[in-house]
Design a protein with these regions (language model features):
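Cysteine-centered catalytic environments shared across enzyme families
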Residues: 1-240, 244-245, 258, 415-416, ...
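An alpha-helix initiation/capping motif
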Residues: 2, 21, 138, 164, ...
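Long, Lys/Arg- and hydrophobic-enriched amphipathic alpha-helices
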Residues: 250-251, 485
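Short acidic/histidine-rich active-site segments
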Residues: 270-280, 284-286
Length: 509
């Protein structure tokens, strides 16, 4: 805090572009009666605000802004369309509630007695990538190592989330080396679900489970490892506090599991953790970067199911839904900086980069921040270093997908420092439960919601359509959001919607 204030006194708002890290802060200059809000370049830390009669109310959470008596828990048609057709994502500037906005990543805002102005201090720029392949490999390695080194600075013991995937393994390896140099042992943490070995079902989105890869990395690094195993009953029950943590419906049990996991990590004595988010967005780790039939589809690649969503709603729940989604998608594509020399695929990869950065990555970062902070745990994300982002944005796709592999450049950069099974493990997302008890618990909960005539959430859904999913949960062929969210997560999302409408007494206008 002291460094930040001194930097502001020296350089005013020019100080913001000199910062490296994750932050959201406000500076009040009493004499000038000037308030300055600023948010980090990638939006790792949230910052919400709303105009009021004599100024501005703001905070790191939506709840904080809602505490002001002039701010009403009201959503309009855009907010409802966001929840039902884009959720759990939301437009970058939206707080979903009608009066609440989100300060955009890489922006600062200034409030004076005269006016309120919004300014950009960082944005992506398109450049020719001038480094050859060996230099690019070396530079990628250097940037990731330096970002991790910066994030390892801590006054309290630090641990790592370890899934046995490439990204968490790289960070755990770098942290373990740092700890070994001080003759200390790194603690690592992983999450799993009861009976997941029995019920796990592989797919193109989730080709394998984590267990054997975690064991291999723990043996390789010699970390003190902790496993958290979650029960389906606890996972379902935690959907409610997970909604409260976001102050919005979220990623269903992808949220509630992380909430329980973070709480367990905190109880275990850890205060700060490193996590591998964002490498997939930057270096092309997701299937939608590689499947041609998805890559050039004219919609959000992780949420191609607007028709499915509309089919689950009552006919009058939302209007002009498809156009609403399409407009947000196209506006985002138009924001992607491009070069006149970009070919069709290169231009599309730039669009995909910005789509993922502004929407999918933002959703995951919001999830990580809210679930961890609600548990009193600080989670750092070294791959979100803006220098890595800038370098990756202009890197040719052939380099990123080196050897025809997702994140091929990152694999090559760390090939000599990790077991080959880890280096060449196919991308697998955050683990989810496949336990039938969880599906049944969520379906039963939704039935109770639908029996309650006071439920706003229930009034939005076509009960027959949802009932058909309950009868045949396997009928949903692909995720309706991201890589993990299928039929059980539809039920869980309805539960979270119901909780949100009730808890915040939300009105639709």
């Amino acid at each position: 805090t002291e460094v930040l204030l001194h930097a502001y006194l020296e350089w005013k708002t020019d100080a913001f572009s000199r910062l490296n890290g994750i932050f959201a802060f406000a500076i009040w200059e009493k004499r000038e009666r000037r308030l300055t809000l600023c948010r980090d370049r990638l939006g790792v830390k949230p910052l919400f605000f709303a105009p009021i009669r004599n100024g501005l109310t703001f905070g790191s959470t939506i709840d904080t802004v809602l505490c002001h008596p002039e701010i009403e828990p009201v959503i309009d048609e855009d907010g409802l369309r966001t929840l039902l057709l884009l959720g759990p994502a939301r437009p970058p500037e939206s707080g979903v509630f009608r009066q609440i906005k989100s300060l955009l990543p890489g922006h600062f805002a200034v409030l004076t007695p005269e006016n309120f102005t919004d300014h950009v201090y960082w944005q992506l720029e398109a450049h020719e990538h001038e480094d050859d392949l060996p230099t690019t490999i070396e530079r990628t390695h250097t940037l990731i190592c330096d970002a991790a080194r910066r994030q390892l600075v801590s006054d309290v013991p630090l641990a790592c989330f370890l899934s046995g995937g490439l990204d968490s393994s790289i960070l755990s390896m770098l942290a373990a080396k740092d700890y070994a140099a001080r003759s200390e042992t790194l603690h690592t943490w992983s999450v799993d679900y009861r009976d997941n070995d029995k019920y796990f079902t592989k797919s193109i989105f989730q080709p394998n489970s984590d267990d054997s890869y975690i064991d291999q990395m723990v043996d390789f690094l010699g970390t003190h490892h902790h496993r958290v195993v979650l029960e389906p009953e606890a996972l379902c029950a935690a959907l409610l506090p997970a909604t409260d943590a976001r102050a919005l419906p979220g990623m269903a049990d992808v949220d509630s599991s992380l909430l329980l996991f973070c709480a367990a990590v905190k109880r275990g004595g850890t205060t700060v953790c490193l996590s591998g988010e964002c490498a997939d967005e930057l270096f092309g780790g997701y299937p939608w970067y590689h499947r041609e039939e998805i890559l050039f589809e004219d919609t959000f690649p992780w949420s191609r199911s607007v028709g499915l969503r509309l089919g689950l709603l009552t006919p009058d729940a939302v209007r002009n839904g498809e156009e609403f989604v399409r407009q947000h998608y196209r506006d985002t594509c138009d924001r992607a900086p491009k070069l006149s020399s970009d070919g069709k695929k290169a231009a599309r990869m730039r669009e995909m980069f910005v789509l993922n950065l502004d929407w999918f990555m933002a959703t995951l970062l919001d999830r990580k921040d809210r679930m961890s902070m609600y548990s009193g745990l600080e989670v750092r994300v070294p791959f979100c270093d803006h220098r890595i982002v800038e370098y990756a944005y202009n890197m040719p796709w052939d380099f990123k997908s080196l050897e025809g592999r997702e994140k091929g450049i990152v694999r090559r950069a760390f090939a000599d420092e990790l077991p080959k099974e880890i280096v060449y493990r196919k991308k697998s997302p955050y683990p989810k439960t496949f336990h039938p008890v969880y599906t049944r618990l969520c379906a039963d909960y939704v039935r109770r919601i639908f029996e309650d005539n006071t439920s706003v959430a229930a009034s939005l859904f076509d009960r027959n359509a949802v009932q058909k999913l309950m009868q045949r949960p396997e009928s949903l062929a692909e995720p309706w959001f991201g890589q993990l969210m299928r039929t059980p997560q539809i039920f869980a999302y309805i539960i979270q919607l119901d909780r949100w409408f009730r808890h915040y007494h939300v009105k639709i206008v």
